[in-house]
Amino acid sequence: NKHSLFIKESAMPELLKQEIQTLININNIENIGSIFNNINSSESIGLDFNSTTFYFLDLLRKQKINTKNLANPCILLKAIKNETELDGAKKAHIRDGVSITKYIYWLKNIMDPKSNDEISVAQHLESLRRKNELFHSLSFDTISAIDKNAALPHYRVTEEGKSFFSDNNIYLVDSGGQYFDGTTDITRTIILGEATTEQKDRFTRVLKGHIALSNHVFEKGTKGTDIDYLAR
């Protein structure tokens, strides 16, 4: 039996559909409920309870179908990149890095603080990325934050609440580009003006933490969630 992929069919390019439909069954995501309702009660269904939505768990349990908690087999396969993906990621990051370098130079040497705010500088960064012929879109809405706004997790600037630059600011930009060969996500905190003694101390502590982390030997079984406290 073929595996089945439930997806919004209108979002799938026709060429891709033709390539993979010989290997798997393609079903419209809107039909998944009715298909689940027709599963034989003698069947057993494997689900990852940590990531499956309650909708599907509830649907199967109402039909008294036996469910088993299994690790999602796609996770590891998605995490392991092939040579084409690795090469694309490297090239995308190099090109994106050029845009970021131009942006930081512009912020420090060209940008007029009196006529710019959190939104206008984010738009300038996007314009630099768009000059790349392989640029598709932003990988997420740019987090552009001046001073105290930079302390807010996943800050979202609005036209009404935007902050303006002065002669002395800390500016955080968390942004990324979606390219046809890779996706980027980069965060930089930039001092515009003269850094205070306290700022120098805090930045130095963070740098020391990063250096120590980069030299750390991770034992087998170390989780990504362990990285933060190790750096601290």
Features from the language model and the residues they span:
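Active-site neighborhoods and metal-handling regions in enzymes and metal-associated proteins
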Residues: 1-232
